[in-house]
Amino acid sequence: MVTPKFRRVILKLSGEALAGQKGYGIDPEVVYSIASQIKDVLEHRVQLAIVVGGGNIWRGISGSTKGMDRATADYMGMLATVINSLALQDALEKIEVDTRVQTSFEMRAVAETYIRRRAIRHMEKGRVVIFAAGTGNPYFSTDTTAALRAAEVEAEIILMAKQVDGVYDADPLKHPGAKRFDELTYIDVLNRGLQVMDSTAVSLCMDNKIPLLVFDLNTEGNIKRAILGERIGTFVGGDLNG
């Protein structure tokens, strides 16, 4: 068995990743495909936690731009992440992957409340932990949740699963000549305003020296390739020269 490069990782999934070609809602076949990739990764004894967004159901910032109270809209977005997390848990458990959903605020009927030490213990026992409901606070994205939880559970890297194969200097769908970066520093991302994650999340990763790998989720087996240390996507870290 190939030894993984990373022992404990956070996988960040967008809500749109669960929607498939429809772009909204949840596509059970897509969720099952993601779950199968995750199961394949666990065979390498990797400790895995997941943060999933809610944009396939609701975006808080979109609601606030149309007159809705921002805090209320963000709480609705947090609930959307819980729906996605339960869908992913269901898919994982159907293929016999022991999974726990932990929410940032109490929802005892459907999930555990987030407790750092319990989350770490679950991972040490080989269970997948899905962190739902964001940070539990409005005005913070699920990218920031991923950075925060990665720092708390001492993850070695955040794997940013996207719909594109890395970070570009322009939208590759609109600009065919856009350049893809193999490596970037946190400062590069912040100074250039690159769409990796929001600036709060990038700063949190920089302060805690948590690297990022941005890669294409749509390529089968890429989660495994990322964890085994294959060169895919775009790596974001500190001083890449030293």
From Swiss-Prot:
Q: Does the keyword Mitochondrion apply?
A: no
Please list the residues that bind ATP. Answer: K12, L13, S14, G15, G55, R59, Q163, Y168, D171
Q: What is its main location?
A: cytoplasm
Q: Which reaction does it catalyse?
A: UMP + ATP = UDP + ADP
Q: Name one GO molecular function term.
A: UMP kinase activity
Listed GO CC annotations: cytoplasm
Pfam families attached to this UniProt entry: AA_kinase (PF00696)
One Gene Ontology term from the biological process aspect of the record = 'de novo' CTP biosynthetic process
List ligand-binding residues for UMP. Answer: G54, D74, T135, G136, N137, P138, Y139, F140, S141, T142
| Positions of the UniProt region annotated as Involved in allosteric activation by GTP | 20-25
Q: Which UniProt keywords apply?
A: Allosteric enzyme, ATP-binding, Cytoplasm, Kinase, Nucleotide-binding, Pyrimidine biosynthesis, Transferase
Query: Might you give the EC number(s) for this enzyme?
Result: 2.7.4.22
Q: In which pathway does it act?
A: Pyrimidine metabolism; CTP biosynthesis via de novo pathway; UDP from UMP (UMPK route): step 1/1
Means of activity regulation: Allosterically activated by GTP. Inhibited by UTP.
Q: Which EC class heads this enzyme's classification?
A: transferase
Keyword ATP-binding part of the UniProt annotation = yes
Q: Assembly and partners?
A: Homohexamer.
Q: Which family would the database say this protein is a member of?
A: Belongs to the UMP kinase family.
PANTHER family reported for this sequence: URIDYLATE KINASE, URIDYLATE KINASE PUMPKIN, CHLOROPLASTIC
Name the NCBIfam families for this protein.
pyrH_bact (TIGR02075)
Q: What does this protein do?
A: Catalyzes the reversible phosphorylation of UMP to UDP.
Q: What is this protein called?
A: Uridylate kinase
The organism named in the record is: Desulforamulus reducens (strain ATCC BAA-1160 / DSM 100696 / MI-1) (Desulfotomaculum reducens)
Q: Which gene encodes it?
A: pyrH
